[in-house]
Amino acid sequence: LAVHSLKDLPTESHPGLLLAAVPPRQDPRDVVVARDGLTLGELPAGAGVGTGSPRRVSQLSALGLGVEPVQIRGNVDTRVGLVGAPAADGGVDAVLLAYAGLLRLSRAEVVTEVLDPLQMLPAPGQGALACECRIEDDATAQLLAVLDDPDTRDAVTAERTLLATLEAGCSAPVGALAEVVMGDEGDELWLRAVVGDISGAPSIRRSATGSRD
């Protein structure tokens, strides 16, 4: 048995492994952790906003707020610790993080703004977990099956199918979010996606609704 952050799984599955369960998804949105309790729009022009994600850099640039993306590395605590730190120590005015990671670490109190997907679409699969086992291990697969959430599985499958169709990896500047919604003929999937460019070129945003099948 292996449990992963689903957004980090390769789009092409390993032939010997089974994705036995995708549990209910944590909040998939991105958040801002900023000094002085500021929101993204309240940061002054030229403020440094830390992120290690090309997807976030491209969408942040597209918002036209005049802030400066700053490349950062490290775990969640390291990144949060950079907020308000001296510039000589790599400090920034704010960082962009996945809400799910902070919730799982019980660090939601540091969040100063939860970003609407209209501003910042998350990575495909963000907020979801993947439970894998060996494809021939029926006993483990049956035990894991009770954890599976069909709505979450269908949503992340749509997001990852988009990523595979674009032949993009998990580090590409691609955001996607699918949700199960009620349509005229029952449940449907609503998929929103963005393909960005870290050079500042215009992003491409599209949305579509279709059958869960």
Predicted features and spans:
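A conserved helix-loop-strand patch within extracytoplasmic ligand-binding domains
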Residues: 6-67
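Fold-independent oxyanion-binding glycine-rich loops
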Residues: 4-7, 22-23, 35-36, 52-54, ...
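Short, Asp-centered acidic motifs that coordinate Mg2+ and/or phosphate
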Residues: 1-3, 93-94
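Small-molecule-sensing regulatory modules
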Residues: 62, 66-213
